[in-house]
Amino acid sequence: MKKACMLALCSMLLPHAYETARQRLIGWPQQEVEEGLIPEGLILKKQGLETAVDADAMMVGETSGTASTQPDNSSTRVIRTGRQASNAEGPGREYEPVMSMGIPIIGYLGGSKLTLLANQTNTQMLSVLVETNQGHMIMIDGGTEGDSAHLVESLLARGGHVDTWLITHPHSDHVGALMDILKHPEYGITIGNIYYSFAYPSWYQENEAYRADLVLDLLAAFQTLPAQTLHGDIFKGQEIMVDNVKITVMNQPYLYTHNAINNSSVVYLLEMNGKKAIFLGDMGEEAGKQLIADNPPEKLKCDIVQMAHHGQDGVGFEVYRILQPEICLWGAPSWLWNNDSGSGMGSGNWKTIETRKWMAQLGVPYHLCIKDGDQIIQ
């Protein structure tokens, strides 16, 4: 009776947040719970009410604060619960076993805003929109051609002008939407600056010939822009200022012959209002080792990390250990998140589950994933 009353109380006070949590918890496979991939508790905060959701018992109970029935989206955020990392390989610092569950993280970026745009097709992709304190837009990659309509809609809703567009590497799931925008000026999107660093076209032909044409198509699309818009000569250590946001180029492309284009990803570090976000593109294990060899740990440490290669078969554990992020951005659709090739969780050959276990070892509290829709940090 007591449990039923508490459940009813919280469902009235937090209808949207509670229902979202309830549905997501019900959807978690028991295998994930047993393997320690699911947080022991989900904590939501709404106008002073703290609600703990137990993943096993599905019991919701008020833990502190004063309840209010008035909706206030501005006060909704993920809060910390506190727990010690259990694996000796991790940094051993306090962490909160919380997944944001698609709830916006509010009051984190001090007036700036980061949106991880959701995939509009069933493929992996990366599209991140950063807004400065003054409202100017910075784009990282942009996703596939199939993601273009949602991206255009998002940009037009904010005025349609992108001050700075950063490209990590020329793969279609990262630059397909940008190419579509460049080919269709009638969309109404304007771009002030595009930053990138590519190898010679012959290098792509030699190492990933089946993707070489895409690079040529992208370079051809660039020719529709004024020359002063294109910055294809960026270098390690270069700093780009957009209002209050400082962008640092962390590497020249590493030209490995194995996993060639992924390993050639340019890494960008964005600093805004005391927080750091690092974008790894599709960087692989070899380039990841080179990245940490070329940069001291204090320069790489960040608050937010975009998971390399959509969270699987990217950089190694040691890179994430040095980064020590608090928030992970996952460009993974549901099938990739669950390593599901069609026969259930864990049936595929991808390494997402392994990477998720790494993050649990490191005590990373917050995980935002494109499978859950547009994800917001502000």
Question: What are these language model-derived features?
Answer:
Residues 119-120, 140-143, 167-171, 197-199, ...:
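Active-site-proximal beta-strand/loop segments in catalytic clefts of secreted hydrolases
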Residues 34-35, 42-61:
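Long, low-complexity repeat tracts used as extracellular stalks/passenger repeats
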